[in-house]
């Protein structure tokens, strides 16, 4: 995102935009419940509550940002169609959101994308284009389609409406747990972390927001230390959902302002938390979500 667009986004009425996002999402995204975790509470000596977005529509929080973005578009824009690039949760979030809005969606995916993910995306009515060997090539093709055919590109994280959509998680936390003191969130591209931090700090700034990253994905640690986006040369982690080399420009600006602390976790801790959630809570949690749980140890 260009710097002028970042500055413009930072000047918007965050409280009003977050409330608007919540209103748009009513009837589409689930208000996921808060679940107490006795085992984590005993381990840490603090009351630990979980917000399982893996139980969200399409299986992840991504529907929130995707739908808020698409709901913000005019009918004329919708008529041109929606396009994005993703090999994971964002693809299904955009496909579902576009279907709800009555828009045609085209999702560009790498040719190596597992058939299960391709089929899951198609099931929501999207056209899937398999292009390129890696995600960057798919993303470049999606951008080309947007330019040539006038389609609207829905970014996975570097977009204000997407961020506000993810921020509705923070609003729900404040509503359901009015005495909350700390919120831990995993950082990948930064849309989720930026949205939650924006919501929490806008409405209850005394609450601490803590980011969590795998030790093999250092972009956020390096960027926050440098005071600017500092892409990682290599990313090695099982948590593919947060395995991002280049954090988003707008997410960085928001997280740099609002994040209280950053915790790095090991692959062993991530894997242990995946098993713990399955054994104690009967929740199937992907590695990216387990990153925030690992930060509690």
Residue ranges of model-derived segments:
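PLP-dependent amino-acid enzyme catalytic core
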Residues: 1-297
């Amino acid at each position: 995102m260009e710097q002028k667009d970042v500055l413009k986004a930072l000047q918007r009425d965050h409280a009003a935009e977050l409330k608007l996002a919540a209103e748009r999402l009513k009837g589409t995204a689930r208000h996921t419940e808060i679940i107490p975790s006795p085992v984590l509470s005993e381990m840490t000596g603090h009351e630990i509550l979980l917000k399982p977005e893996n139980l969200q529509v399409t299986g992840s929080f991504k529907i929130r940002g995707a739908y808020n973005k698409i709901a913000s578009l005019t009918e004329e824009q919708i008529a041109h169609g929606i396009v994005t690039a993703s090999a994971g949760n964002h693809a299904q979030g955009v496909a579902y959101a576009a279907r709800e809005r009555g828009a045609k969606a085209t999702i560009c995916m790498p040719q190596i994308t597992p058939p299960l993910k391709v089929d899951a995306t198609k099931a929501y009515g999207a056209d899937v284009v398999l292009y390129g060997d890696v995600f960057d090539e798919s993303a470049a093709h999606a951008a080309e389609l947007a330019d040539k055919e006038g389609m609207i590109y829905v970014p996975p994280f570097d977009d204000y409406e997407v961020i506000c959509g993810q921020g509705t998680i923070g609003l729900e936390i404040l509503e359901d747990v009015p005495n909350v003191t700390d919120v831990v969130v995993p950082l990948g591209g930064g849309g989720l972390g930026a949205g939650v931090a924006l919501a929490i700090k806008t409405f209850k700034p005394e609450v601490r927001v803590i980011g969590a990253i795998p030790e093999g994905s250092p972009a956020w640690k390096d960027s926050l230390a440098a005071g600017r986006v500092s892409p990682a040369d290599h990313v090695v982690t099982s948590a593919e959902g947060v395995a991002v080399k280049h954090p988003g420009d707008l997410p960085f600006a928001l997280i740099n302002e609002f994040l209280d602390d950053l915790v790095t976790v090991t692959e062993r801790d991530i894997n242990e938390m995946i098993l713990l959630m399955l054994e104690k809570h009967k929740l199937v949690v992907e590695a990216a979500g387990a990153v925030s749980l690992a930060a509690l140890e």
